[in-house]
């Protein structure tokens, strides 16, 4: 098994050759380590990445044989968003995946992350075409500012919409594209401090925790609307999403 950090789908901003090849090269950077672990060797393009960062790979005797003998048997990855490669924009990698130019065709979260369920289907197909191994989505979710109503309920329909759309995209990848998907786990079950921004206000969970960004609060836990929705999704094995 190989688990990589969050992986974004990458689209070229235009059909300009520099955007197209730039997106391609940006993608290869993201997939370098999985290429090694699934193909059992360092790809030809790895040296150009090493040169870019001034890195010298030291291989011990027998390392190449070990890589070749023990390839990974499935790929686990996190998916939150897609990005656009624009030759005129900065393109970076963060805890949430690859990040580039904004996509005018997609809505975003309060933190500017594109919401793209179809992008997950795209990535599933891309990875299976590349590795021909089963896939496992181990993180998928949206950070949002949740509001507690006077009666204590949290109506996070936006989170339900996000998860529903992505689960439907997985179903299409399985049923229409015949991609073997082993499983899916959302991020996350309970609110915790965001690893990306250090904020408690950026909530991913289906269970609300009464704590603010300064650590103040009762720590009381409350089930959000998404909790009951996902409970039903589990009971029906994903057959009933509405």
Regions found by a protein language model. Give the residues of each.
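Active-site region of glycoside hydrolase catalytic domains
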Residues: 3-242
């Amino acid at each position: 098994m190989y688990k990589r950090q969050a992986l974004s789908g990458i689209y070229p901003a235009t059909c300009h050759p520099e955007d197209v090849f730039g997106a391609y090269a940006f993608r290869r950077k993201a997939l370098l380590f999985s290429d090694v672990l699934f193909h059992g060797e360092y790809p030809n393009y790895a040296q150009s990445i090493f040169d870019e960062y001034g890195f010298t790979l030291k291989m011990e005797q027998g390392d190449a044989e070990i890589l070749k003998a023990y390839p990974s048997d499935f790929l686990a990855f996190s998916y939150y968003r897609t990005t656009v490669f624009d030759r005129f924009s900065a393109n970076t990698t963060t805890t949430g995946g690859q990040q580039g130019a904004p996509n005018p065709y997609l809505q975003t979260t309060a933190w500017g992350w594109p919401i793209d369920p179809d992008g997950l289907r795209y990535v599933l197909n891309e990875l299976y075409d590349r590795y021909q191994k089963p896939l496992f989505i181990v993180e998928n979710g949206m950070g949002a500012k949740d509001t507690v109503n006077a009666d204590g309920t949290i109506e996070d329909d936006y989170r339900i919409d996000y998860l529903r759309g992505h689960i439907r995209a997985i179903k299409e990848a399985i049923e229409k594209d015949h991609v073997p998907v082993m499983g899916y786990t959302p991020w996350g079950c309970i609110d915790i401090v965001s690893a990306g921004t250090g904020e408690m206000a950026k909530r991913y969970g289906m269970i609300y925790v009464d704590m603010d960004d300064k650590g103040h609060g009762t720590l009381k836990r409350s089930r959000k609307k998404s909790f009951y929705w996902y409970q039903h999704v589990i009971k029906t094995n994903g057959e009933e999403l509405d």
